[in-house]
Each structure stands twice: as structure tokens, then as C-alpha cells.
Amino acid sequence: MSTVQRLNEITANLGVLYAKLHQHHFYVKGQDFYKLHELFETQYNEVHEQFDEVAERILMIGGKPVSTLGEFLALASIKEAPYTTEKSGRQMVEETVADFELFRTQLEAAIHSDIDEVSQDLLMV
């Protein structure tokens, strides 16, 4: 798999993760509302920064970053989860942890693959 392909998979996962974190931010309720509302906002802002950096790296190496929701959903291993039933704050946190664990596994695989060193360094921060 080429560096651009690997980075596009990461971009897709960041796009889906960004949307899911926003969803949790919008819908969180209950006694932990303020704490979780702020946490999800912090996380989606950090994911947005990573998303932008990875897409810019793809452009720097002559590739085209995926940029549509359809492309994100087709390439991402993190799956969207429509908010059809109410979730507790705990369920949202558990879902977020599972998504980040899946994403970490993907990052580790990319770092240990044959992608270029600059891209590896970008993924390690």
C-alpha cells in the first residue's frame, strides 16, 4: 500500500471520528454534561488539527486527500453511528475509547509500514 493510500485511510478515519465526536458533543446529557461536553469539544478540535495536517502531508507528497463524506465512509475502519436512540455519557465515552483504540491500531500499522520517514514522524505526534 502506498503512503498516499495509508494516509488517506487515516484521513478518512479522522473525518468519521471528527463527526462522531461532534455528535457526542451535541447530544450529551446528564450530570456529567459540562465535563463531557467540554471533553468532546477538546477532542474534536484536536482531531481536526490532525485531520488537516495529514491531508496537507498528502498534498505535499503529490497525492490527493480524500475530502467527501462518501470517501470517508468508504475508506474508514471507524464506522459512523447515527444517533437513533439516546446514549448515556458513559456509552459515549466507551464508544469514543473503542474508536480511538481502533485508530491507534491503524496508526501503529502505518508507522511500521514502508511509508516515508516524514509521514511516520507526523503520525507519531
Protein language model regions, located:
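Short, small-residue-rich loop/turn micro-motifs
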Residues: H25, F72-A76
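Conserved alpha-helical segments that form or flank metal/cofactor-binding pockets of metalloenzymes
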Residues: K29, Y34-E71
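Helix-loop segments that flank and shape redox-cofactor active sites
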Residues: S2, L17-T42, R104-L122
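Acidic/histidine-rich alpha-helical segments that form the ligand environment
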Residues: D52, E56, A76-V125
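Long, contiguous binding/interaction regions
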Residues: S2, F33, N45, P65, ...
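Disorder-to-helix initiation segments
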Residues: M1-I10, G89
